[in-house]
């Protein structure tokens, strides 16, 4: 799809912030995370039955939604559970993303698709160009620990579960560095978005 631009990175690199900036400039977007969260909630009771053997903690919140923090702890520490979750959710997420992409592509204007596991999934390659947001590993770890209230060990486990950021950079069509202030990052984002917009006219 000529109007599709995928946004990916490692954890806590600024993908969602890029999307917010793009939205503020009048560009539409799709978020794999938001779609995934909705799918988890819609299938909460079934997922609770599947994953309750993996944990002594209650996977359901009071409002009958999945406790994503507990589910995250399970899948990041158990390869079997991770595979089960991926097999359950990924086809549903991909179908929804492709459905929304087809709608936006008809508008003949650049749009952005935020997919954290773009390279890991291998399900979206050749569907559009790729923007990789770069943050050094040390900074990513610090942000993960602060944002998600995780220990260094837990943060490393989450980061190590993904393809190394340096490998992702090699496959990028566009690279945006997020290593300094928000103002610097926004400037880098706007620059790339403008470049894409001009090339897509």
From Swiss-Prot:
Supply the CDD domains for this chain: DPCK
Q: Which Pfam families match?
A: CoaE (PF01121)
Q: List the disulfide bonds.
A: none
Report which reactions are catalysed by this protein.
Answer: 3'-dephospho-CoA + ATP = ADP + CoA + H(+)
Quick one: a GO biological-process term for this protein? coenzyme A biosynthetic process
Q: Which PROSITE patterns match?
A: DPCK (PS51219)
Q: In which pathway does it act?
A: Cofactor biosynthesis; coenzyme A biosynthesis; CoA from (R)-pantothenate: step 5/5
Provide the Gene Ontology terms for cellular component.
cytoplasm
Which compartments is it annotated to reside in?
A: Cytoplasm
Q: Where is the DPCK domain?
A: 4-201
UniProt-listed InterPro entries: Depp_CoAkinase, P-loop_NTPase
The top EC class is transferase
Q: Where does ATP bind?
A: 12-17
**Which keywords belong to this entry?**
ATP-binding, Coenzyme A biosynthesis, Cytoplasm, Kinase, Nucleotide-binding, Transferase
Q: Report the GO molecular function annotations.
A: ATP binding; dephospho-CoA kinase activity
- The principal location of this protein is cytoplasm
Q: Which NCBIfam families match?
A: dephospho-CoA kinase
Q: Which PANTHER family match?
A: BIFUNCTIONAL COENZYME A SYNTHASE-RELATED, DEPHOSPHO-COA KINASE-RELATED
Protein role: Catalyzes the phosphorylation of the 3'-hydroxyl group of dephosphocoenzyme A to form coenzyme A.
What's this protein's family per the entry? Answer: Belongs to the CoaE family.
Name under which the protein is recorded: Dephospho-CoA kinase
Q: Which organism is it from?
A: Campylobacter jejuni subsp. jejuni serotype O:2 (strain ATCC 700819 / NCTC 11168)
